[in-house]
Amino acid sequence: MIKQRTLKNVVRATGVGVHTGEKVYLTLRPAPPNTGIIFCRTDLDPVVQIPARVNYIGDTSLSTCLTKGDVRIATVEHLLSALAGVGVDNLYIDLTSPELPIMDGSAGPFVFLIQSAGIEEQNAPKEFIRIKQRVKIEEADKSVMVEPYNGFKISFGIDFDHPLFNEHNQNATLDFSSTSYVKEVSRARTFGFLSDYEFIRKNNLALGASLDNALVLDEYKILNQDGLRYPDEFVKHKILDVIGDLYLLGRSLIGSFSGVKSGHTLNSQLLKQLLATKSAWEIVTFKDPSELPFAYTPVAMTA
């Protein structure tokens, strides 16, 4: 039987919210089988818990935000991406601020935290959501789609008019049966343009942004002295975001995702449309490990 997984130990980190600029204390705690991923605002009395599920998605303008009443938790996608990438099903995430810490702008530090805590199997079958038929949403020149595939694959295309972008680094297809999330995706950082920075700051956003937690581009070049971590780091970060958004389905996806110029808003619309189309998916478990798509085997997920 393919089993659910949680952390072996509690692990903590401190960081800054990229939009609020506020210091935040983060604690990851093991959770029982069938809990799912639960965010806990421990700075509130009483503590407010928000499950990482599609029906709690709120604002998606610059990040994916979860809301419950008037309580919000912003920028959840990078940590969720890390949890999906290494296969953690059940977890309590305590935080002392309305936004998760941005860390270095990627999922890499979260992967390190998870690996430091250790992962253990639980005595309950792991559930997957398997795509049975295509679901697609288009909006002008943007589109997102999921379709059947016996594995986990993401294709993504971006289109920026900038000297650093070309067709080689604006399109990527990653099949996770042969691609290591940890090595090839998790370290891709969020990026932004200096030309947008003034507008964003005027709107009291990106108050915690810096060259330490984002790739920043002027008209011609990257301002970060260390340059790119991957030749296609920009599009790989978009794929990192997609993996985090998809994990709001509450289960790992068996299927293929394709996106063109999409962001958190279109991604969330696709998730809602998918769940509303009952014939397009099914929940599956695997008693026989040999039937599990290779992308989700321990060998693939720990590479």
Curated annotation (Swiss-Prot):
Active-site feature positions: H264 (proton donor)
Q: Which cofactor does it need?
A: Zn(2+)
The pathway entry for this protein reads as:
Glycolipid biosynthesis; lipid IV(A) biosynthesis; lipid IV(A) from (3R)-3-hydroxytetradecanoyl-[acyl-carrier-protein] and UDP-N-acetyl-alpha-D-glucosamine: step 2/6
Which reaction is this enzyme known to catalyze?
A: a UDP-3-O-[(3R)-3-hydroxyacyl]-N-acetyl-alpha-D-glucosamine + H2O = a UDP-3-O-[(3R)-3-hydroxyacyl]-alpha-D-glucosamine + acetate
Gene3D superfamilies per record: lpxc deacetylase, domain 1 (3.30.230.20), lpxc deacetylase, domain 2 (3.30.1700.10)
Gene Ontology, cellular component aspect? membrane
Q: Where do the annotations place Zn(2+) binding?
A: H78, H237, D241
Q: What does this protein do?
A: Catalyzes the hydrolysis of UDP-3-O-myristoyl-N-acetylglucosamine to form UDP-3-O-myristoylglucosamine and acetate, the committed step in lipid A biosynthesis.
Please state what the protein is called.
UDP-3-O-acyl-N-acetylglucosamine deacetylase
Organism of derivation: Coxiella burnetii (strain RSA 493 / Nine Mile phase I)
Source lineage: Bacteria, Pseudomonadati, Pseudomonadota, Gammaproteobacteria, Legionellales
